[in-house]
Amino acid sequence: MQVFDASSMIYAWDNYPVDQFPGLWIWIAAEINARRLMMSIVASGEVCAGTPDCGDWLVTAGLERLDVTNEIAQDAMRIKGLLGVVGDNYHPKGVGENDLLIIATARAHGRELISNEAQQNNPPDVNSKRKIPSVCSMREVAVPCIDFVQYIRRSGAVFR
């Protein structure tokens, strides 16, 4: 079971148009309806703000949006501390507050995170420069993270 972040959903929407890849979107809707695919309310808000037609499609598909609980907010703060971020001084090349909430949501629900943020093969010299996949790979965070294409390949689904 997976949680999508905004980058992956917008990537899918922009690169696999519904009219040209209807089988893919029927399958994604089925995954949503089976509750195998969800989104943090934070990521959903980002999708709706940036790509309203995709947001509308997700609502129509019945997407379950996972709320940010006190436990999730506290875990996001813990991760923020691991990154050495003080106050609102997030590094422009690293994760932001919403990203931490999305990671903490996936962690709280024991879900794999699907993110299309850039992979960093070598962790940056400054932890606050880490992107979502790199933060997820930290031992103290330990959230499995894959990108959209890996998600599709691993599913074994065939779209005709």
Annotate the PLM regions.
Residues 32, 58, 105-106, 136:
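A generic structural signal for well-ordered alpha-helical segments
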Residues 1-39, 45-60:
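Short, well-structured N-terminal submotif of metal-dependent ribonuclease cores
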